[in-house]
């Protein structure tokens, strides 16, 4: 099918910028597409009178033609009244929902502005605004954006809490533009958060909000106490106040899991990354020499053991979701094995089973556990093996030389010779 047989949709609205170069047809005689609003026919058009498409009701025979909205009673306020309680027969379910949604747009737009400036509101419009008020402003705006979801949605089961009036979301967030003229209910003021969020007639909602508000208030108080405790903590390595460092990214504590000495995260990580000392010295605290398995980064200083255990649990749970860079989704080998805190998983998401540690007996008789045997382990062990001092080696060579000279000397039958200086 050629594109010239398809009418340009932009030309229909007078906004085609291609002109004669357009690949689609600009001839309305060959193709007359339907400009009827399909959302209006479903009863979910959120634009109302501002819609650019034709609002035509479907005929009773199922055809595409019908009377436009202004002839059916939707063109003005009087037409709206005829559409709601029209004498031409009761409206269907879709027709009723359509009229309610069209009137919602008017209630949210023109009617409330008129009432703010003291204009007399029609009694019929007042009844419609009370009966057809949406549950929230967001719901009224989103109406018509997902027509299929609206058609398939089942009506909610009416309960005791759903019959209560809805709280105004703008008043709950701090300020409502309509104030006392607002259709929605303004809640009571909460003493903790200072917002109008307490429903006057729903005790369950009040208790739930007060409980949530108190929990948030306690969390904020704990953060305030932790910030106050961290104000004067000095790093034991760089001797600077951690929270007063010039670089904001350096204002973090490196909390050791086994001691309570204060270090900034950058200094303690630099200490533990050095290769000058043995592994035991690197993992120990620079002050008390207590070995700590890992360092927990924290914005606030934690000193209590219970709080530290909670922080360690949070740290482990967060780290366990990150992929291990040494394991590399099965392509590499992690030197920590089953003790690694990071995630060991393959590309398909399955977790790798931890390797069983293997025992190795060194030449000195020491037994150590290792996950994998590599050539580099033997080279590293040989380099770290202690070398005897040179004076002891010279003494051994001197003893061997003296023993050799004695064994290679003359027999006892001959005359004895005095020992030389070399011997």
From Swiss-Prot:
Stretches the record annotates as Makorin-type Cys-His: 190-219
Pfam family, one: zf-CCCH
Compositionally biased tracts (Gly residues): 61-90
Swiss-Prot/TrEMBL catalytic activity: S-ubiquitinyl-[E2 ubiquitin-conjugating enzyme]-L-cysteine + [acceptor protein]-L-lysine = [E2 ubiquitin-conjugating enzyme]-L-cysteine + N(6)-ubiquitinyl-[acceptor protein]-L-lysine
Keyword flag Plastid: no
Zn finger (C3H1-type) location: 2-29, 31-58, 162-189, 318-347
Key words of the record: Cytoplasm, Developmental protein, Differentiation, Metal-binding, Neurogenesis, Nucleus, Repeat, Transcription, Transcription regulation, Transferase, Ubl conjugation pathway, Zinc, Zinc-finger
Zinc fingers (RING-type), renumbered ranges: 235-289
GO cellular component: cytoplasm; nucleus
One GO MF term: ubiquitin protein ligase activity
Location of this chain's protein in the cell: Cytoplasm; Nucleus
Residue ranges of the region described as Disordered: 59-90
EC number(s) per entry: 2.3.2.27
Pathway per the UniProt entry: Protein modification; protein ubiquitination
Biological processes annotated in GO: cell differentiation; nervous system development; protein polyubiquitination
Its job: E3 ubiquitin ligase catalyzing the covalent attachment of ubiquitin moieties onto substrate proteins. Inhibits neurogenesis and axis formation during embryonic development by modulating the phosphatidylinositol 3-kinase (PI3K) pathway. Acts downstream of PI3K and akt1 to up-regulate gsk3b mRNA expression.
PANTHER family with a match to the protein in the record: E3 UBIQUITIN-PROTEIN LIGASE MAKORIN-2, MAKORIN-RELATED
Name listed for the protein in its UniProt record: E3 ubiquitin-protein ligase makorin-2
